[in-house]
């Protein structure tokens, strides 16, 4: 499993990460990439302080604007998977964060060998009414509120660079 989160995108992934950690024997290799614009934008700082010392997984952290006490690297979240270099064999990558981060993370995962079916993201930012009536959340022929908000890259790849 590979979790890639940017900014507040760690919030929806955190419970999934903890579930994987609580049931570690059921999963293979685990990589977590998390980053934010600045130290003030980091969420779950206690986890971020303890996770890098946890030998059950690899952790890579990035900040767009550096900080004195930051343990990770400078840069943008989409570059993180390249640093961790996760194996795509029998793996799934879960991506959650700002739209621009999501858009630029998929090509990097693709270069690492992940297929569009192995890449999962959530697009709830697009939802408006939440019941499929307003049509504002459509992406191609899909409605985020009805068909998602979780999608594989295979489902949205033809639309994500144009509309998201």
Task: Describe every region a protein language model picked out.
Residues 135, 140, 151-164:
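Short Fe-S-cluster ligation motifs
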Residues 1-128:
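FNR/FR-type flavoprotein reductase catalytic core
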Residues 100, 124-149:
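Local cysteine-cluster metal-coordination motifs and their immediate loop/turn environment
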Residues 42, 131, 155:
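Short acidic, gly/pro-rich beta-turn/loop elements at beta-sheet edges
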Residues 34, 61-64, 140, 144-147, ...:
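Short histidine
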């Amino acid at each position: 499993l590979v979790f890639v989160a940017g900014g507040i995108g760690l919030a929806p992934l955190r419970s999934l990460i903890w579930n994987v950690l609580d049931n570690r024997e059921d999963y293979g290799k685990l990589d977590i990439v998390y980053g934010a614009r600045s130290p003030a934008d980091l969420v779950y700082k206690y986890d971020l302080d303890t996770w890098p010392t946890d030998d059950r997984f690899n952790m890579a952290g990035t900040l767009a604007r550096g900080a004195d006490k930051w343990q990770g690297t400078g840069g943008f979240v989409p570059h993180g998977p390249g640093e961790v270099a996760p194996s795509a064999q029998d793996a799934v990558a879960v991506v959650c964060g700002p739209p621009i981060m999501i858009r630029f993370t998929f090509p990097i995962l693709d270069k690492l060998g992940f297929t569009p079916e192995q890449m999962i993201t959530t697009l709830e930012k697009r939802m408006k009414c939440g019941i499929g009536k307003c049509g504002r959340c459509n992406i191609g022929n899909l409605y985020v509120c009805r068909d998602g908000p979780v999608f594989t890259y295979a489902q949205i790849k033809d639309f994500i660079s144009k509309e998201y």
